[in-house]
């Protein structure tokens, strides 16, 4: 009888030990890192072009504390790939000819903030050697000044901003660099391009609202870019009237 009791006790202890080990192994086995879900949550939180590396790492550690180093590397690689795809898509959307009104804000010689309205055509041509940059031409017109034509270089940077560098004029003036930050972009689709460009080396801000006039096919493609995702980083509460802009431009404006 004593031997039977001892044997039963040993069996119970073995079963308890097996249960505890099994529970621990089950927890590890049941953990699954859902990469697609993590990407969706991340871009919903930080927008189409994410945020800085430190904030990204902190966000990942907070929401996925049990993820492995491999999971984190997979996540970062997927984020970078998604951002590069967005850059490429934006550049392909820009590729072609856009037309519409542009309002240029600047200060006159009396120090007053004023604006001039133009009708513009922006022609973007994607480089054959790059997916995110190229050359272009701006045609700008109003009745008082007539028409001007200026060539430029452009690119979509890693933050979704569109950088435009106008070629130096024949008079020797330095090139003018304008920047359309992603949070100043109302909309970019295959048919509509609206936002605000801000001078980098000149104090000027331009509000524009353009529609696609002619699509431009990329070399090697047989069809134009199909309609798809719409880009835009500006929220309604970010939009402010430009009346208080402190703008000083040599000779009035570019």
Predicted features and spans:
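Sec-dependent bacterial lipoprotein signal peptides
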Residues: 1-22
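Bacterial Sec-dependent N-terminal signal peptides
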Residues: 17-66, 70-86, 207-215, 242
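Calcium-binding acidic motifs and repeat modules
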Residues: 35-49, 66, 105, 138, ...
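Beta-sheet ligand-binding and adhesion/scaffold domains
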Residues: 76-84, 158-254
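N-terminal helix-cap/turn-to-beta initiation motif at the start of protein domains
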Residues: 80-99, 127-129
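Generic short beta-strand segments
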Residues: 99-107, 135-141, 165-169, 196-200
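N-terminal glycine/threonine-rich, aromatic-flanked beta-hairpin/loop signature
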Residues: 109-161
